Amino acid sequence: MDLFLFTVDPLWGSAVVRAGAAGIVVDWERRGKARRQLGEGTQINADTADDLSRMRAATTGRLLCRINGHGPWTRDEIDDAVRRGADEILLPMVRGTDEVDRALDQVAGRCGLGILIETQDAVDRAAHLAARPLSRIYVGLNDLRIDRRATRLFEPLVDGTVDAVRAEVGMPFGVAGLTLPECGWPVPAALLAADLVRLGTDFTFLRRSFTADMEGRDPAVEVPRLLEAVAELRSAAPEAALARRDEFVTAVTGRSLALDRSAAAAVPA
């Protein structure tokens, strides 16, 4: 599973990539975000064009740039990101195919274009979106929860939503984010990692929880340890994988799949 670190710190970013992360994300998305996420406690970055240039100079890892949702500014943002060395553009808050097609035209093959599925409209159109020549698709749980007016962040991982999107995606697929296996809240990172493995997730993000949990730790030790933990989950026995899925669902919903299965088995035919 590829790990992409959100950062504009050249020393930190290059150390994490040298330790085994696949690359860096520089985050330009801010238009309408403060209003959309008001009171949600989410992270809103203030990364700049110069930050992208600095991160390009700092690492040979894959460099992704999340721009703003599609609008009159998109062509200029794409041109600037390409000029500064972005390997891929990430287009957030997608709702339909028209904006994706316009962005693909504007990219014009100069770099990859990935999209973030983080609205119910995009979930409903996942098959059509996945038919486009995209470099990757990521399901963003924070904005999806807000768009759905839901309360539980990880609900789409247990109600079939992410499974349904995953089934449509043939290019690299990502969802959620990880931190060190023994950390993570409100769901332990080890259980979340197991569910990402269950889904066949190709990549995920390392964000503020990872950076906070890494304080005083050596990336050269901790990043390989995280990757090794994911590799071990991939080779787990089916019984162990089923048990972890039950633990994950219980952590998200408070309801045990094992108890549900037992209750169903007890019902007379």
Predicted regions span which residues?
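Conserved N-terminal beta1-alpha1 strand-loop-helix module at the mouth
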Residues: 1-63, 70-72, 253-269
